[in-house]
């Protein structure tokens, strides 16, 4: 959690292992006993955050009765996670991370895992697995970009996030219902 906060505040390139060690209350050699490099620490952190996001979505849709409810519950879970876990969201989806091939690869792994989950919820008769996967990436992109904008406005829990998530879910649902094979 300490590394998460430091990376969220300063970004990957603005963060040093000295700062992480100091914030954690350990020496740099102790930190290097656990992580071979700043990149290794960051990758492990991104993997853990991706697992948390995926878990939040899966748990969020677990009690949904049908496809439309799954879409809405999924967006609500995503928005709740993004607003509750602001530093984690910033580490995962900071736009500058995409410019670096190493960081982008770690983040693409998270997006792929989430898209795989979302693809399993898309039920369109006659749609191939590849087509379902492409649509899932569209849904993930919609969630990520709208959440980033929402958080960029300084909005969060209690400021209409649930209503906004419902609107984005409606947008996604309407789009998915328009898909025909």
Question: Which residues are covered by each model-predicted region?
Answer:
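Helix-turn-helix
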Residues: 2, 6-40, 44
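Amphipathic alpha-helical packing segments from all-alpha helical-bundle domains
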Residues: 51-54, 101-126, 133-138, 145, ...
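Alpha-helical DNA-contacting segments of helix-turn-helix folds
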Residues: 40-49, 56, 106-107
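Hydrophobic alpha-helical connector segments
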Residues: 44, 58-87, 124, 135-139, ...
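Short amphipathic alpha-helical elements of helix-turn-helix/winged-helix folds
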Residues: 2-6, 81, 142
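Short, charged helix-capping/linker segments at alpha-helix termini
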Residues: 13-14, 126-130
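Short alpha-helical scaffolding segments that buttress acidic/His motifs in well-ordered protein cores
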Residues: 78, 92-93, 139, 172
């Amino acid at each position: 959690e300490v590394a998460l906060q430091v990376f969220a505040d300063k970004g990957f390139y603005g963060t040093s292992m000295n700062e992480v060690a100091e914030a954690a209350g350990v020496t740099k050699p102790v930190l290097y006993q656990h992580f071979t490099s700043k990149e290794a620490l960051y990758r492990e952190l991104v993997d853990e955050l991706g697992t948390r996001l995926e878990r939040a979505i899966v748990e969020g849709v677990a009690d949904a009765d049908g496809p439309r409810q799954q879409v809405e519950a999924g967006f609500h879970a995503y928005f709740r996670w993004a607003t509750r876990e602001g530093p984690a969201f910033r580490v995962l989806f900071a736009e500058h991370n995409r410019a670096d091939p190493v960081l982008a690869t770690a983040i693409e792994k998270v997006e792929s895992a989430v898209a795989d989950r979302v693809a399993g919820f898309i039920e369109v008769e006659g749609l191939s697995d590849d087509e379902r996967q492409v649509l899932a990436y569209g849904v993930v992109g919609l969630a990520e970009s709208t959440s980033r904008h929402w958080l960029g406005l300084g909005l969060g829990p209690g400021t209409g996030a649930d209503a906004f998530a419902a609107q984005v879910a409606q947008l996604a649902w309407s789009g998915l219902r328009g898909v025909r094979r």
